[in-house]
From Swiss-Prot:
Residues 42-749 are lumenal. It is found in: Endoplasmic reticulum membrane. Gene3D superfamilies: Phox-like domain. Residues 439-489, 504-546 are annotated as: Disordered. Has a role in meiosis. It is a single-pass type II membrane protein. The gene is mug122. CDD domains: PX_domain (cd06093). The keyword Endoplasmic reticulum applies. Residues 311-422 form the PX domain. Coiled coil: none annotated. It comes from Schizosaccharomyces pombe (strain 972 / ATCC 24843) (Fission yeast). This is Meiotically up-regulated gene 122 protein. Belongs to the sorting nexin family.
Amino acid sequence: MYRKWDLCITRHLLPYIEHSVIPIIALLVLSLIFYILYICFGTTSYILSGIILGAYVNSLFHNNHSVILNIKHPELGEPLKPYQTPLPPELEAPLQLLISKLTQHYINGWYKHVSEDPSFIREVQSTIEYIMRQFYAYVSSQESSHIIYELLKNAISTTTLVLSDLNHFRSKKIPLTEFALRYPESAVSKLLDQASIERTLRAQASAMIVKFSRPEDSACLPLHCLLREVLAMQVFKRITTHCSSPRFVNRCIILYFSSSEDKSDCLAKKNYVNKCLMAKALKDYPVHTNIDPDAGKLSFDDAFYEAHIELHYQFLKEASLNTLIKDKKMLKFIITVRPVHLHVSPWVVYRRYRGFKTLYYLLKKQSARNGRAVPSFPVWRGNTYEKFREGLYFFIEALLHDSHFATNVDVRKFFAKSMRSHPLVDDIYNGFDVDKKHQSSSVPTLPNLTNISRVLSNKTSKSAKPKRSERTGLLSHQSTLAPEPLSQQRDSFELCTTGYRDTGSCTSDDEDSIHEPYRPASTQPTENPPAMPDHNGSPTTEPPKPNAFELKEERLKEIISGGFALVDELCSLNSKLWFFRKSVLTIMKTTVLHGPGRFSAQVERMLKNQIYDKLSNTQLVGDLLTSLILNVWPDEKKAMESHSTRAHRRSTESKISFDSEADSLFEEASKSVPEDPVSVFCDEESDESLRLRAEKTLVENALSENFTLMLGQSTSEESLKIIFELLQEPQFVQGFLAHLLSNALRSII
């Protein structure tokens, strides 16, 4: 993208030093002569040396007294042409449309205010096009079965882990955001954390830039950061934000699970995406797609940093505050936590002296390894209740005002919410303050705050207390009481969803992703990548054609096992007859994998028909990309006009002349979406009616008849209702789509 300064080395000072050793010998002789002159003439030798050196430097000047440095200034001509990988016509138009939108809508919007020179915009546009074409060339050269296998494996594992976490969330019967706050290492917390999502998308964008851009462009850190923000925030995040809106999700549910004749007609005409999926059917209001850069980010990492704390005794009167402490068992506290960097309501936790002391010992043990000093802990002996409370308050303040301790796992668990209304009964079994007498007691929970909790907690008394055999099966499958399994799954979930180290700092994370992108061994390509073009843009070899779709027996069995694990977690959303359904699924899995019939061939044929044929259909993929781009940026044409108007507000022209090339690309891509699509899915409906229609369609048509008979009608309906309520949460869906997109890019790259 940029030109290097051609600084030619002058050869006047040391002529021909690279061709022989004579200059070195001459330098030694001159040093010897200078030493002899110094012995003979003393300090006068410095004056003689200065005269000789001045005469030599004078020979470097022309008549106009300018030093010969031979600096060649760069020539800002046409940008380097990107690698012209032959793209199908169905994919060429979406690529040009996307590049035009990114450059004109994002870069041109702020660059026009500072400069009228379009060279920078052309260079950025050329670089983005180069990356996209290299990405397509790389994907085309890879084995299709390997890519589909990696995509399926990561999607199934991510979905299974999220469902397993939701089963733990269902057992707690608490709102989704509070569950994520109390269990920051869970998969749900990762999906709701906007800062974590942005780090994940930036990491994948950096990996794409490092692998598919020119070496000189990747080495330029300012350009790298600009391209990373364009890909991560303007492409990946805008798409996931648009697709996570409830209206979009409900339209997709109605479309994919509807059995109307219009859908069959669209499928037969291969206009499935154009006429049904996109256009007016999925065009949301602009508020769903606009991203407010000044909006606060929901980050659970900063939940306790600089939080306001109120510390009071639980059963102590004010008149007794000045008395001496006789027994530490009387030190029972009520702590009110008011977060500053997280927009949630304050909560109350109940802790004893034993819990504070345990936290202090844990932090002190960790400080022995990292060398970080822990704030001093007050002594209760010989102190009054008031003095001890002040010392304890200063201890808490010192912890929460230190970013290292405020983000510590033990500190976060200590100040996590207590969802029980009864004092000193904490359902966070972390070793701080566990009252074994009340562990089995039934205490009322606080009112639920979201529709998800209402659906999950809307159980009958019979379903709330499963039978002994069912409880045994539940305990053998997963622990629903202690949060330790969630912490043990942290590494596997981070590897499954991000694949990058979470350093907690955007700067260090960006540097790691720029210089050393993480690429697991399982995702390395099986073949050599296509030959990269030189700096002039001419390739050395053409990328080979994709291979035929064929999966090995081991990979098919792994996909089948993952599918049964996914169904197992889906069935676990309902506790009724869970042990019986688990036994049936185990028998079916054994029959499919080790039975006499070769079911793997049927699975392979299904994957080929449902996934491979659709991904290899360039017309279908091109229509999907075109329609999605036009709906993610619905008012892009108006944005171009406003940007140009602000840039030329001092001009006397009353009419803005647009770039003819951008207009032609926009008109060409707009032809893919008809203005008046004929489809029953394009009827204007209210959000509530659309929601009810989508819920009914999902419950009735999502599962096949055989699968419904195996699970039971009520069981399948209840599980699907829980899934539907989760799909109505935009933050949850956005995080899930972002991690799926990250998994797909990591599998391909």
